[in-house]
Structures are given as C-alpha cells and as structure tokens.
Amino acid sequence: SVVKSEDFSLPAYVDRRDHPLPEVAHVKLLSASQKALKENEKAAWSSLSMDEKVELYRIKFKESFAEMNRGSNEWKTVVGGAMFFIGFTALIIMWQKHYVYGPLPQTFDKEWVGKQTKRMLDMKVNPIQGLASKWDYEKNEWKK
C-alpha cells in the first residue's frame, strides 16, 4: 500500500483560537443528509431547528471555542510522572545511605567540632577579620 502525502500548498482545516475561520470546512465529503442540510441552509435560518444549526456548524468546524478552551488532563500525567521519579530517587538515596555509605566520620560530631574550634582559637587563626578576631581572649568568650 502506498501512503499518499498531503499537499501543503492547498488550503487545510485547522482548529485554532488565533485563527478562528479555517480556509476549508472540517467535513470535505458530505453525506446525502448533509448535502440536503446544506441546501436547507440557503433558505431562511429561522426555519432551521437548533439541531440542524448545530449539524451545520459541525460540518464547518470540528470544535467550538468552548471545546478548544477546555483544559486537558495532561497536567495529572505530568505531576504523576514527576512524583514517581521523586519517589524513586528517594528510594535510591535511602538504599545508598543504608548499604553504600558508611557511618559519618568522627569529625562531624559536635564535640569534635568544638575541640577543633578551640584549637583554631588557641592558634589565633586569622586574627584580623576571621575567627580569632571575634573571640575575647581575656574573658574566654565570643565578643558581643
């Protein structure tokens, strides 16, 4: 079977809010009832019923503005996919913390950090603008 490509130099039907009147009608090949309805269209529109007017509209347009403006439910898929990947990442991180990484080194203990800070103060590290400049050596406390 041969696939026939569409000739884009010819007018095409497009449903867009910024282009409300397409160049051609939505339905190109009319059935017998649609042809009869198109003949009735030439008469007074007051003689047509509401269903006939809607059918005429559907021949010309695929969607109304209300249908075009209706929101899609795609956001639910996007949020669901994002939550899935966030949850999967959390599971990987928990697995890594339990099985891959060892315990924290002793240098992260509060006691160790306090001893290291005291050692830096005793060595008077960066006495002009740094840590030692904020320490009162006479009172043995932080300056206020």
UniProtKB/Swiss-Prot annotation:
GO terms for biological process: mitochondrial electron transport, cytochrome c to oxygen. Residues 1-73 are mitochondrial matrix. The modification N6-succinyllysine is found at K4, K35. GO terms for cellular component: mitochondrial inner membrane; respiratory chain complex IV. Residues 100-144 are mitochondrial intermembrane. SUPFAM superfamilies: Mitochondrial cytochrome c oxidase subunit IV. The modification N6-acetyllysine is found at K4, K28, K35, K42. Its main location: mitochondrion. Component of the cytochrome c oxidase (complex IV, CIV), a multisubunit enzyme composed of 14 subunits. The complex is composed of a catalytic core of 3 subunits MT-CO1, MT-CO2 and MT-CO3, encoded in the mitochondrial DNA, and 11 supernumerary subunits COX4I, COX5A, COX5B, COX6A, COX6B, COX6C, COX7A, COX7B, COX7C, COX8 and NDUFA4, which are encoded in the nuclear genome. Belongs to the cytochrome c oxidase IV family. This is Cytochrome c oxidase subunit 4 isoform 1, mitochondrial. It comes from Hylobates agilis (Agile gibbon).
